[in-house]
Regions:
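Loop/turn-to-beta-strand initiation segments
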Residues: 140-141, 175-178, 207-213
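Walker A/P-loop nucleotide-binding motif
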Residues: 106-128
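Interdomain "pre-motor" coupling segment immediately N-terminal to P-loop NTPase/helicase cores
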Residues: 28-71
């Protein structure tokens, strides 16, 4: 997969945000146990599981997935100037994204996500990475793939020298707390590729795992800047699952104010 030797940007991020991800050999990210996943009470001579146990186990299972945030978006947070500027143009959309990020643990525990539909340059990728950063800072496991890169990674998993075989790689993609998919539908998948995407999305749907995605394609009803809808590009089965998992947040140019974004609980 090529993740064993991270580039400079990836190393820098792992030294920063990613050192907060729970690991089997790391100290407790919550500071509640000694790093072994158990909270002991010397007075009663008892022990109870630490909440980091579940995240440590997930971190082990999802090692090897791509999870770096690109340099362009690494500084993006809830109150970044770029987010504030976007909020002036698309208040409902930014409010939905912020609400999701502020309640990241609850959202991931429920398996809810968001889908950002919009023209290039409207801020959808920025909001997606704002959410992913919140998940990382909360100690949750994440995987970040562009649609073309994900398809390439699936093909690579068939190679004899692959770090993870096909089955193991798909299991990791299903198991990670948050899967961010950028440019979903950027290329028309073959029948084989469409089936792989369905297996991933359906697996996450059944496991109540969150998906945050971005796409330049129109909403299911045809609303948006592109002639083709996301459902037409990736297929009705995948779109049906995503529709339940990740409510669409439209960001289409000058018409942003006229759209309604989902109001998360």
């Amino acid at each position: 997969m090529g993740t064993d030797t991270p580039n400079t940007e990836t190393r820098a991020l792992r030294d920063g945000l990613f050192n907060r991800l729970p690991d089997a050999d790391a100290a407790c990210p919550y500071g509640e146990c000694e790093g072994d996943g158990w909270i002991t009470d010397e007075a009663t001579k008892t022990a109870r599981p630490c909440k980091c146990q579940k995240q440590r186990a997930s971190a082990r299972r999802t090692r090897g997935l791509t999870r770096e945030i690109p340099e362009r978006y690494r500084h993006i947070g809830l109150d970044s100037p770029e987010v504030e500027e976007l909020a002036a143009r698309a208040p409902a959309q930014v409010r939905s994204a912020r609400r999701y990020a502020e309640t990241i643990d609850d959202q991931l525990d429920k398996g809810t996500g968001l889908g950002f539909h919009g023209d290039p340059g409207t801020g959808k990728t920025m909001l997606a990475f704002m959410i992913t950063r919140s998940a990382i800072e909360a100690g949750r496991t994440v995987a970040v793939y562009s649609f073309p890169r994900l398809l390439a990674a699936i093909r690579d998993s068939y190679r004899d020298d692959a770090t993870d075989g096909y089955g193991a790689f798909l299991d990791k993609l299903v198991d990670v707390d948050l899967l961010q998919l950028d440019d979903l539908g950027a290329e028309r998948p073959t029948e084989w590729a469409a089936e792989q995407i369905f297996l991933i999305i359906d697996g996450r749907y059944e496991a109540k795992r969150s998906v945050v995605y971005t796409t330049n394609l129109a909403l299911p009803g045809g609303e948006g800047g592109s002639e083709e809808t996301l459902a037409e590009r990736i297929g009705p089965r995948v779109m049906s699952r995503l529709g339940e998992m990740a409510p669409p947040v439209p960001l289409f140019g000058a018409d942003q104010r006229s759209h309604l974004a989902p109001d998360l609980p």
